[in-house]
Amino acid sequence: MINSLLTRVFGSRNERQLRQLNRLVTQINALEPTIEKLSDAELQAKTPEFKQRLAAGESLDKILPEAFAVCREASRRVLGMRHYDVQLIGGMVLHLGKIAEMRTGEGKTLVATLPVYLNALQGEGVHVVTVNDYLARRDAAQMGKLYNWLGLSVGVVYPGMPHSDKREAYGADITYGTNNEFGFDYLRDNMALSRADRYQRNLHYAIVDEVDSILIDEARTPLIISGPADESPELYIRVNRIVPQLTRQESEEGEGDFWIDEKGKQVHLSEAGMGHAEELLLQAGILENAEDGLYAAQNLSVVHHLNAALRAHAIYQRDVDYIVRDGEVVIVDEFTGRTLSGRRWSDGLHQAVEAKEGVPVQRENQTLASITFQNLFRMYKKLSGMTGTADTEAYEFQSIYGLEVVVIPTNRPTVRKDHPDQVFLNRKGKFNAVLADIEDCAKRGQPVLVGTTSIETSEMLSEHLRKAGVKHEVLNAKQHEREATIVANAGQPGAVTIATNMAGRGTDIVLGGSLESEYHALGEDASEDARFKIKTEWQRRHDAVKAAGGLHIIGTERHESRRIDNQLRGRAGRQGDPGSSRFYLSLEDNLMRIFASDWVQKAMRMMGMKEDDVIEDRLVSRQIEKAQRKVEAHNFDIRKNLLDFDDVNNDQRKVIYAQRDELLDAESVKDNVDGIRGDVIYDLVARFVPPNSVDEQWDLKGLEATLESELGMTLSLTDMVRAQEEIDAEQIAAKVQTAVDAHFAEKEAAIGADTMRALEKHVMLTVLDQGWKEHLAKMDYLRQGIYLRGYAQKQPKQEYKKEAFELFSEMLENVKREVINLLARVRIRSEEEVAELEEQERLQAQARLMASQFQHQDVGGYGAEEEVEQMQGGNAPVPVSQVTRDEPKVGRNDPCPCGSGKKYKHCHGQLS
């Protein structure tokens, strides 16, 4: 009550921020008359002037009003577009490192030019992040005219571009690209074997377009670079033949072999199902011993394959979750409806789906490098974003990324009419009503956009409309090549467009059709008369559509997130245009069936409802919203859980990547090698001759054999001990150390100091990369089974942290030992041989990258649902990580970032 009273008196926090920013808008507008009088040359000269002022110590905030005024005037001259006052506010919000919520059609692309121009003046690079390559290239081409005119360079990065071009794009003042490309390039850079092979500079400032889609929807899935593992895909094909013989239970307690947990996208074998599966696997010769049972240690790989095959058959549907194209299984993005070519599900799921569809089964992949979007974007010194729908996820933006959401007012009031949901008993009744609404709109000349959640639904509706003789277009993963043309015409009078999840399409639907597309089709040489005719005809259509009610949005199903529904609605009513929306639902829809309360269904049936009867009631709408909130909370838990685990990996990733950077930058790593050699020899001797021990405890023969097998050195320690009457363990260790040092000195004298330095650096990098790759595989296995610790009354997250630390320490020790062993045994005659070795390794690394899969991991892996429940059950709350604005270098005497409490040099800085 006190809060609401204070809000009434002082306004909400959002209103107070807008008032504060309006003062800066007044300053910018006051500068406009002066800036307008400048010639083109004088306006362009402002860019070097701003750079000089920044170099002299002036802050970005100080020059903001003048820089925004210059950018606005340049935009008016170059693009023919002048920023509105609300767009200036949006630009300020982005500059301040916050999220600007701006409605569809309010010109987010133009808004971004203001903070991009201002921050690019620092010369450290600005990344503009989009959801797809088309938008990245389009925006770079359109807005690049403005930036180039103002004296700033622009680059765009996309998959498959030549190495030199990509380096140049990252070296530009402003770089456009997708979130995936920026993420994969970061991982590629940290697999590079020389500075020349790297693309990116420091991560300075990023503006993320459709920020909710990238930082929330896609944050459930890590970016992974993986290479083919050695295991044959044959087992997937054999297990696939067995799964169709298993039957589904209708309920958890019913008859059958397995039941489906639809919320968690999991399949669970029943008691009877385990027995039936074992029987079938024995008959097929996949299980060898009937006594061992399915869950014996040696059969865990079979369990993994069986679970993947069950999920592929029971949960993942063709033309909903994936399509089959040119003999390949291609994933369909559940949020945007786009195909994700080149991406693969992990945990064997993709191979299981390939086996199910009868297409060639690719080898399972081994992780080479991975990162989540949360940890990628938190590495930027400054991060901001824009979207039409962020306010519903404000808590997550604040708690995970430290980003505040500011809702920007529209330039003109929104007049769209959002009609209440209509709820039907079944899908047939719902689609009859949808088809009737579409036909009514088409007759009246009102354009209609129909949003569906799957390709299957869009094609079913298309078939019904074709039979009814209604002309229409379908926009889904199968027709994405024609996307621009379809969207350009979606606002024509009476146009009917069926689209799977319009979220993130990035192109406005203009009432009357796209005038810009018609001008483009005319060509640049078209006469003014021809352009005038086009404009007159477009205006007639535009007015006719407005009179018919503007664009009408039909939603055929509620999405699991309210935000996606709002994005669909937001396609209508842009910039004060008229428009309307309505959602048609049925009790058979996934959201209603899985999450809505049973009483809604019972009540509708008790009322004797028929399939064409409809309910429009606030109580039902509230139940639907409640169901959506449940799903949103569930998905937040999954993302938070993923982040808690990846934070452990991230601490280790930072240490490894920091050490790689030091190795790449170092002229010489001799001091590192000398230090490592001392540690390795001390540990080696201590295994056979423990410190402070007596000669009866020594194993000199074992030490001699190990020195020969691991270091290629022959030392007669037994004779040496016989020759000296009094010798202790410390003296033996010193003798071995001296002998090994001499062995390395001889090698260096033989091949030359420069050759030795190059060899040391090459070996350290290669061994570190191999060790990290093997460590990631171990971490994957640890992650998959850690939730089971919850059944032993242990906290899985704490257990994961503890074991991950032990694995990491073990990996570092193995790396140190392998470096010394290789350097001791390798035979090199000249520096040219080292250079040739490095070049071969570099080419092999590039070949591995070319053969690698770039994927989003499917987080609904075996046991993922149990993981979330186990992580939450009885665990102390984990402190929420705030956005890291700057990553200082870890000093040798600083506390290690892994949290052990030791100094960095005594913990994970041991390689440095």
Curated annotation (Swiss-Prot):
Binding residues for Zn(2+): 896, 898, 907-908
Alphabetical list of SUPFAM superfamilies matching this protein: Helical scaffold and wing domains of SecA, P-loop containing nucleoside triphosphate hydrolases, Pre-protein crosslinking domain of SecA
A GO cellular component annotation in the UniProt record: cell envelope Sec protein transport complex
Cofactor or coenzyme needed: Zn(2+)
Substrates-to-products reaction catalysed: ATP + H2O + cellular proteinSide 1 = ADP + phosphate + cellular proteinSide 2
Cofactor binding description: May bind 1 zinc ion per subunit.
Xref: PROSITE patterns: SECA, SECA_MOTOR_DEAD
Topology class, membrane: Peripheral membrane protein
GO biological process: intracellular protein transmembrane transport; protein import; protein targeting; protein transport by the Sec complex
List of residues binding ATP: 87, 105-109, 508
Biased composition range(s): Basic residues: 902-912
Localization per record: Cell inner membrane; Cytoplasm
Region (Disordered): 864-912
Keywords on record: ATP-binding, Cell inner membrane, Cell membrane, Cytoplasm, Membrane, Metal-binding, Nucleotide-binding, Protein transport, Translocase, Translocation, Transport, Zinc
Enzyme Commission number(s) of this protein: 7.4.2.8
Gene3D superfamilies per the UniProt record, alphabetical: Helical scaffold and wing domains of SecA, P-loop containing nucleotide triphosphate hydrolases, SecA, preprotein cross-linking domain
GO MF: ATP binding; metal ion binding; protein-exporting ATPase activity
Enzyme class name: translocase
InterPro entries (UniProt xref): Helicase_ATP-bd, Helicase_C-like, P-loop_NTPase, SEC_C_motif, SecA, SecA_CS, SecA_DEAD, SecA_motor_DEAD
Family from the record: Belongs to the SecA family.
Subunit details: Monomer and homodimer. Part of the essential Sec protein translocation apparatus which comprises SecA, SecYEG and auxiliary proteins SecDF-YajC and YidC.
Name of the molecule in the record: Protein translocase subunit SecA
Gene giving rise to this polypeptide: secA
